[in-house]
Design a protein with these regions (language model features):
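Compositionally biased low-complexity segments at domain edges in trafficked proteins
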Residues: 113-142, 147-149, 153
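Glycine-rich, charged/polar anion/phosphate-binding loops
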Residues: 7-8, 128-131, 167
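Eukaryote-biased detector of low-complexity, proline/serine/threonine-rich segments
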Residues: 67, 71-78, 129, 223-230
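Active-site pocket scaffolds in enzymes
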Residues: 44-58, 138-252
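Histidine- and aromatic-rich segments of cupredoxin/plastocyanin-like copper-binding domains
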Residues: 1-121, 205-212
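Short beta-strand element of the conserved SAM-dependent methyltransferase core
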Residues: 72, 82-83, 96-98, 123, ...
Length: 252
């Protein structure tokens, strides 16, 4: 966390009664994390920089490129771990420390936060934008994209819609259109999909990055074509991006 190893973790000092904002950013190249704070719950207030109705959870999953702002109520004095564990398991998690100012000499609580395994996990369906969302309606254009790759026949190629960048055809759009993107994940790995230059509506929230679960997971989003240019749309797993899982969104 913040460039520090668990053996010498970053520490954040708080005082009892404070409301503490934590800005969680996953800049990783290939790791999705489950995040929890020992002895405390988290109230999510923003995702990808956009405000949402507050929702209180015990843990959240943050994909590569995603961002969350959460507020922690400092009402449980002590020295607590803030842990980011991989979605695959709990071995060697990243760690920081939430230390109350009056807890000098107190030892860090042992073990992983209970919230990593129990309690309420944040789901995209929990997120409700406080901003006005683009009205729902029939899209002017729809792209159906199968996310696949890593197969035995060609393990070093990852594709969107059966095509690998840079040889993939652009996704052509026209200014003023409402565009819908439907993604189905044919692979065994999670894909955090990121669109440059736009925020999109994913359910009832505005985001610019959305996770597509493995093993036939599906995700859809809609956006208004209102920022002319040539924009990158890609998986934020950098290994998949490098191996072709990207397309250009091109205004025509």
């Amino acid at each position: 966390v913040n460039g520090r190893l668990p053996e010498a973790p970053a520490e954040f000092e708080v005082r009892r009664g404070e409301r503490v904002r934590l800005r969680l950013i996953n800049p990783g190249g290939a790791t999705t994390y489950r995040v929890a704070v020992g002895g405390h719950r988290m109230t999510v207030t923003h995702t990808d920089g956009r405000p949402v109705e507050p929702v209180t959870v015990d843990r959240l999953t943050i994909g590569m490129g995603e961002r969350y702002d959460v507020v922690v109520e400092a009402e449980n004095p002590g020295v607590w771990p803030l842990v980011a564990a991989t979605v695959e398991g709990d071995s060697a998690p990243a760690r920081a420390v939430l230390r109350y100012a009056d807890a000098a000499g107190s030892a860090l609580r042992d073990g992983l936060p209970e919230g990593l395994q129990t309690g309420r996990a944040l789901r995209y369906g929990d997120l409700q934008s406080v901003e006005t969302l683009p009205a729902e309606g029939a899209p002017d254009r729809t792209f159906d994209l199968r996310l696949s790759g890593g197969m035995m026949m060609d393990p070093d190629v990852w594709t969107m819609g059966g095509q690998a960048y840079p040889d993939a055809a652009p996704l052509e759009v026209r200014e003023g259109e409402r565009v819908r993107v439907n993604m189905s994940n044919m692979s065994m790995m999670l894909h955090p999909m990121h669109l440059h230059g736009h925020f999109f509506r994913a359910g009832n929230v505005l985001k610019d990055t959305v996770q597509v679960a493995p093993h036939m997971g599906r995700a859809s989003f809609e956006f208004v074509v209102d920022n002319p240019g040539r924009w990158f749309f890609h998986c934020h797993n950098l290994y998949h991006l490098h191996a072709g899982m990207a397309r250009e969104v091109r205004y025509v």
